[in-house]
Amino acid sequence: MNKRKLDIGKLISANVAWFVLLILVLFFGIFSENFFSFRNIMNLLSQNAYLLIASIGITFVMMSSGMDLSVGYVMSTMGVIGAKLLVDVGLPSAVVIVLMILITVAIELLNTWLSIKLRLQLLVVTIATMTIFQGATYIISESKTINNLPDSFKFWGQKYLFGSVPVSVILTLILFLVMSFVLNKTYFGRKVYALGGNPEAARLAGININKMRYSIAAIEGVFIGIDVVLLIGRLGSAVSTMGVGTEFTVMTGIFLGGVSMRGGEGKLSGVFAGILCIALLTNGMQLAGINIYYQYVVRGIILLAAIGYDVYQMTRRDNMKKRKLEEAREAKRA
């Protein structure tokens, strides 16, 4: 009986986000008549596709024990740059998409290069670059909304396939499946876990730490670039405030999904559930007419709770390791 309780406890502990998501789905399903309709589910996924895709890149960074706070303003900067290239310069959509992804990759590589060369945590570097991109966004956009994006660009955010499935949802699901495979089943994925779990042990095992950091930065850049394409494609316009705060919403979902603050732990499947939990809560608060400022308070409480739970889990694991070491030493003495 105790073993069964222990197994259930481990199952819940390892899949907190999925259990929370199940509770939320049941709750909203009971009180909302059309919640389980195919159309509503597709709308929920398409509206939050940009958060889900951003979470893939940010998860890789956090898995390797990094933290990037510049994501929101990188998104807004790339959004207005992409819109300017489309509307003012008149470049084809395909060219602009490639340029946006390449520039975003370059930005993330620059952040990582500064972190390595200045021997600073990525968190500290991105606090500085976040401010730079904040100013750059307002300068480039002149604090104006850029409209009239071509239909070929809006395809990624607004169009449907098979009659009723948004392109953004299909793309999101494919990317999650592919990157989950990369993280869980490939040598590169194992190196990401090793880098976050114990960088010194990873170095002694022959892993090139700096090369891995650059690779992870490039992955984040690709997904943030794709993310911006979907976001402005869905909105049909770009504004200097778009994307701001995305990193905190995504990090809340990532922590809730089981990714540890110190890296080396977690799965993208849990992150997927964590982001959907935040999306459902936000949607529910909006439907209930809760003031946006109260929504910020709730999100902050959830983020704090998710971090607190992560710290509790880390402390418990550390204590268990210490206990096992002590038991092993006592066994040797005996």
Question: What label would you give each PLM region?
Answer:
Residues M1-L22, L204, N208-K211, M285-A334:
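Cytosolic-side transmembrane-helix boundaries in multi-pass membrane proteins
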Residues A17-G29, I58, I101, M130, ...:
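Hydrophobic core segments of alpha-helical transmembrane domains in multi-pass membrane transport
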Residues I23-V89, L114-L120, I254-E265, I301:
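Single transmembrane alpha-helix segments in multi-pass membrane proteins
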Residues E33-N43, I140, L183, G189, ...:
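Inter-helical junctions in multi-pass inner-membrane proteins, predominant
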Residues G90-M130, A273-G274:
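Alpha-helical transmembrane segments within multi-pass membrane transporters and channels
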Residues L91-V98, I107-N111, L161-A238:
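Helix-loop-helix "hairpin" substructures at the membrane interface of multi-pass membrane proteins
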Residues L118, L122-K185, M212-S215, R234-G243, ...:
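Transmembrane helix-bundle core of multi-pass membrane transporters
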Residues I224, R234-V297:
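Transmembrane alpha-helical segments in multi-pass inner-membrane proteins
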